């Protein structure tokens, strides 16, 4: 899924690389936790190994899943690749890229791959993940007051 945002990549990166920004994208449906005082600073990210466990809270309060967050690749201001395990998924892979477009805008692209622990739930997972990323992109477009349209 991709969206064009009415802000330069550096501004978009600042937003998406912060817990406040991540949780704004997910709200009001979900919230992710992080250790108190954690800085999402590129030089502090331990590439290729578990960084921390983030609880995923339904409606911001009900724990229903966790993400053992592992950032495999990081290009600050441009791209990250997360390859983690979750309570619900044996494999969770999320790649997000930022590319400059037009007159100071950014194309933000998310690519997700997952393997649920329970195969029978694959369809439900796919539906929830697609809806969640549509919601996240809508929140980002609103936040950056984009006049561009989304493409899936």
What do the predicted segments below correspond to?
Residues 1-46:
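Hydrophobic ligand-binding cavity/cleft-lining segments
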Residues 2-6, 70, 97-99, 113:
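Generic structural detector for well-ordered beta-strands
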Residues 8, 76, 101-105:
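Short strand-connecting beta-turns/loops that link adjacent beta-strands
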Residues 12-16, 22, 52, 71, ...:
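Hydrophobic pocket/interface hotspot
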Residues 34-85, 146:
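Glycine-rich portal/gate segments that line the openings of hydrophobic small-molecule binding cavities
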Residues 81-131:
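Beta-strand/loop substructures that line and gate deep hydrophobic ligand-binding cavities in soluble
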Residues 131-139:
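A non-catalytic, amphipathic alpha-helix used as a structural packing/dimerization or gating element
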Residues 145-152:
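Generic C-terminal helix-cap and adjacent flexible tail
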């Amino acid at each position: 899924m991709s969206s064009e945002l009415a802000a330069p990549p550096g501004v978009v990166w600042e937003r998406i690389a912060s817990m406040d920004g991540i949780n704004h994208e997910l709200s009001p449906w979900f919230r992710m936790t992080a250790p108190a005082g954690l800085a999402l600073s590129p030089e502090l990210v331990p590439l290729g190994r578990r960084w921390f466990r983030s609880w995923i809270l339904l409606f911001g309060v009900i724990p229903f899943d966790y993400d053992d967050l592992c950032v495999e690749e990081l290009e600050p201001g441009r791209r990250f690749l997360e390859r983690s395990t979750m309570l619900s998924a044996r494999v969770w892979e999320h790649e997000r890229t930022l590319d400059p477009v037009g007159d100071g805008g950014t194309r933000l692209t998310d690519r997700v791959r997952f393997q649920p622990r329970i195969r029978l739930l694959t369809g439900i997972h796919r539906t929830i993940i697609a809806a969640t990323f549509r919601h996240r992109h809508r929140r980002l477009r609103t936040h950056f007051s984009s006049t561009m349209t989304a493409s899936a």
